[in-house]
Amino acid sequence: MTRAKRKKEHIDHALSTGQKRQTGLDDITFVHVSLPETELSQVDTSTKIGELFLSSPIFINAMTGGGGKATFEINRALARAAAQTGIPVAVGSQMSALKDPDERPSYEIVRKENMKGLVFANLGSEATVEQAKRAVDMIEADMLQIHLNVIQEIVMPEGDRNFTGRLRRIEDICRSVSVPVAVKEVGFGMSRDTAARLFNVGVQAIDVGGFGGTNFSKIENLRRDKAVEFFDQWGISTAASLAEVSSISGDRPIIASGGIQDALDLAKSIALGASAAGMAGYFLKVLTASGEEALAAEIESLIEDFKRIMTVLGCRTIEQLKKAPLVIKGDTYHWLKARGVDPFVYSMR
């Protein structure tokens, strides 16, 4: 099967499998503030990922590219929506364009349609330093995402089976490229142990890519003759991943992703320690169902709803929201206790 056809299958299956509310974010409840002393018009949603300035913490996370006309049109629409709303946009893995120059336009269109905005490049952890540099140059990227997708690869019929040397390659890339490097999971979550190893080799930001959003095990199982369904429920939830990584990150930025679908999910993610949050599957559904203008309108609505939540919590800035008290219950509470992460840090601040 060609890489382009596989990319198209991924999009189709991502839309058909849907997202389940298994992010753990439903286990999170804010402590209500009856006297917030805030005004909606004074709320500042700006944030930073390292030295990159974002007007709001929402961005369009990596989805696709390298699948011919279909992915070209999707990326063009995503880039236009990002430009219209002033949020960053990430492209999907650029390996296909590095191997086949005919696929470059489906990625280059993102920068062409979003000349002044933040654009993130994307490659897998199998990439070399030279490939990383070419991916950044291809779209004049402001940041490089390196994705970790072991479960997807092991389930994928034609996927990788050798995962040795990945950390060393990531370290080499961090030392060599001219832009910040963020490492992201793709829906299976990240432990504090993995995050610590990545920070130690120079990774500037971690995108936890938690369980509960687009499920690449289910997607790849739809492409297999014999499914390996035990991986369909494999992973660490978005909420647990954020709390784990936040416990060791210090002042290094964390990015939330994995099933984030509304402003409340976004606010909870920030309060758990994220500086920004990427949304992919939800935005793809809005785009394919209602079009580019509807997507831009939905992004604007999300930002306004997010401001409302910050207002009632008494938070004028993202840094204040990161300190908002919340209570962790249910499976997320038990996971964190078992892992030695104190959930009461959040409720008693």
UniProtKB/Swiss-Prot annotation:
Cite the binding residues for FMN: 62-64, 93, 122, 184, 214, 258-259, 280-281
Residues annotated to bind substrate:
6-7, 152
Binding site residues for Mg(2+): 153
Alphabetized, the UniProt keywords read: Cytoplasm, Flavoprotein, FMN, Isomerase, Isoprene biosynthesis, Magnesium, Metal-binding, NADP
Required cofactor names: FMN; NADPH; Mg(2+)
Q: Where in the cell is it found?
A: Cytoplasm
Mind telling me which GO cellular component terms the entry cites?
Answer: cytoplasm
Q: Which SUPFAM superfamilies match?
A: FMN-linked oxidoreductases (SSF51395)
**Any coiled-coil ranges, and where?**
none
* The enzyme's E.C. designation: 5.3.3.2
**Stretch forming the signal peptide:** none
Task: Quote the CDD domains the UniProt record gives.
Answer: IDI-2_FMN
- Please describe what this protein does: Involved in the biosynthesis of isoprenoids. Catalyzes the 1,3-allylic rearrangement of the homoallylic substrate isopentenyl (IPP) to its allylic isomer, dimethylallyl diphosphate (DMAPP).
Say which family it is in. Answer: Belongs to the IPP isomerase type 2 family.
Name used for this protein in its record: Isopentenyl-diphosphate delta-isomerase
Source organism lineage?
Bacteria, Bacillati, Bacillota, Bacilli, Bacillales
| Encoding gene (name) | fni
